[in-house]
Amino acid sequence: VIDVGTRLAAPFCAGLLGEMGAEVIKVEQPAGGDFMRTIGPFEDGYSLFWAVEGRGRRSATLDLRRSRGQDLFRQLAAHADVICENFRPGTMEEWHIGPADLDPRLVLVRISVFGQNGPKAQRPGLDRMGIGYGGLMYLTGYPDSPPVRPGVTVSDYLTGAFCAQAAVAALYARDARGRGTGAVIDASLYGSILRILEWTIAAYDRLGIVRQREGNRLPNSAPLDNYPTADGRYICIVAGSDANFARLCRAMDRLELTEDPRFTTLAQRAANADVINGIVAEWTAPRNATEIEATCVAADVPVASAYTVADIVSDEQVSARGDVVTVEDPVLGPVRQQAPFPRMVGAPPVVPSGAPCLGEHNREIWCDLVGLSEDELAGLAAEGIV
């Protein structure tokens, strides 16, 4: 897999393929490398974002804006199965490394904000444009407040994940199903968001409903909210169904609520959501989060604390499943990070190699794989091509 992308979406796709077992080669500009290397937080000037999302691949530098660099890229591509890119549409063609210039057996993953065609295709943009035009930003937040972005770059990650799935399917069709040719996967950041909008488009089409922000609640379920606790935390309780509501009432020692005509059915509880959520909040407010969670777990009520990262890395479930691994970074040494996900039962755990230094593997890639001599590589370095 050749990762010729920048920032996050295409590199994340390549990284997922690497965590499935692919060999990934990161191709970066000689001056500075991937922009991801410049994004904080930093430890002694070194990007921790890069330490996570640059892992599991080798780094080779190459100036794709110059004809010799383009020629070398085509030579490298002859060894590849998949190429992942997220340049503005037309850039690969301008550099003579687009689909028409490459082996048709390649699977070319192309990610951009708006896709390769359409009236907005040439606009610049990042994750924020994806969640904006995809409709997620409008739906995120509280009804009486402006739209807000989700806590992480959802459209970049989601598009990368969808594209990794598509790349594997394309390889399967090429090899196992005998198609013989690869595929061009054309993905937009906003399109990945559209795909997870649940019933939003269908309800607008059939009922004229324009879905609005709902905060932590759902319009057709209650009690359901993030409730305050005595120790300044928030805890999510989901007890919309009749069975879960009865269990919660028993846990709160408020069984009489199950007979209250305002709460006897799901529809009635949803219609009186402010009231029932207020009752639950009154129960949680004087109690600590751990006490509330233990009580709900004992009663078989769905519950979750709103975890900070400190909670995550110390949680016994995370530890038991190996969801945080220690990656040996070439600059920082051991760094705890998210483990590859998902995992196959019975397969040995995968611990990715650390994110490479810029051009760390130039000799391996350009000499051992592509076939340049040491003198040729030195000449290219002197010219700034690598």
Language-model region placement:
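Oxidoreductase and adenylate-handling cofactor-binding alpha/beta cores
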Residues: G160-A183, R195-L207, C249-R254
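N-terminal helix-loop segment corresponding to the beta1-alpha1 unit
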Residues: V1-R177, C357, R363-V386
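Short Gly/Pro-enriched turn/cap motifs at secondary-structure boundaries
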Residues: W50, E214-P219, D225-N226, L332-V335, ...
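Flexible, small-/acidic-enriched active-site or ligand-binding loops
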Residues: V331-G379
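Conserved Rossmann-fold dehydrogenase catalytic segment
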Residues: Q116, D144-V154, D175-I193, Q212-P219, ...
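Glycine-rich beta-alpha junction loops
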Residues: A31, V113-G115, L189-L194, D231, ...
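Aromatic-enriched alpha-helical interface/lid elements that frame and gate functional surfaces
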Residues: P223-A299, V303
